[in-house]
Curated annotation (Swiss-Prot):
Name of the protein this chain belongs to: Inosine/xanthosine triphosphatase
Binding site for substrate: T8, T9, N10, P11, A12, K13
Organism per entry: Salmonella agona (strain SL483)
Enzyme class: hydrolase
Swiss-Prot/TrEMBL catalytic activity: XTP + H2O = XDP + phosphate + H(+); ITP + H2O = IDP + phosphate + H(+)
SUPFAM superfamilies in the cross-refs: ITPase-like
Gene Ontology biological process terms from the UniProt entry: nucleotide metabolic process; thiamine metabolic process
Family under the similarity heading: Belongs to the YjjX NTPase family.
HAMAP family in the cross-refs: Non_canon_purine_NTPase_YjjX
Cofactors, names only: Mg(2+); Mn(2+)
Binding site for Mg(2+): E38, Q68
Quaternary structure (record): Homodimer.
Length: 171
């Protein structure tokens, strides 16, 4: 059984990690341990580079806390131009897989507040009345009318980031 350290305690992200690992390695093939670690970037990262750095930092910090694990996984959400997206970073001590998620364009009413220094999650909670929306369906769930959720979009990015770990051509 793979010991997987999730560099987040966010249920939406943990669900995506678990589903993706079970899709690739088989049901019941892994045990997820969530840990809260620092990203080293602002609460609301801006741009692909800063967001990716946050995910990389979380993986490195999780690995320092739990060096005995088989995998360390981080999902860092950010804002790039007028959209939200995330970077997924997965490490197994030998190689690293990284993938960027799909992007969701955000309306100006939301972006204006985020650009003024507020994090997307609290802005969306205020807008929707849903407490801790970032730990649930997220802006993705709201603006796609539930057709996608934060977790479902992250799931795809985790699957992509896992590609180097089960395809020999990457080695």
């Amino acid at each position: 059984m793979h010991q997987v350290i999730s560099a987040t305690t966010n249920p939406a992200k943990i669900q995506a990690i678990l589903q993706a690992f079970e899709e690739i390695f088989g049901e019941g093939s892994c045990h997820i341990t969530p840990v809260a670690v620092e990203s080293g970037v602002p609460e609301q990262p801006f741009g692909s580079e800063e967001t990716r750095a946050g995910a990389r930092n979380r993986v490195d910090n999780a690995r320092r806390l739990h060096p005995q694990a088989d995998f360390w996984v981080a999902i860092e959400a950010g804002i790039d131009d007028d959209a939200t997206f995330s970077w997924v970073v997965i490490d197994n001590g030998v190689q690293r897989g990284e993938a960027r998620s799909a992007t969701l364009p955000l309306p100006a009413v939301i972006l204006d507040r985020v650009r003024q220094g507020e994090a997307l999650g609290p802005v969306m909670s205020h807008y929707t009345g849903i407490d801790e929306i970032g730990r649930k369906e997220g802006a993705i769930g709201v603006f796609t009318a539930g057709k996608l959720t934060r977790s479902s979009v992250y799931y795809q990015a985790v699957i992509l980031a896992l590609s180097p770990f089960h395809n020999a051509v990457y080695r």
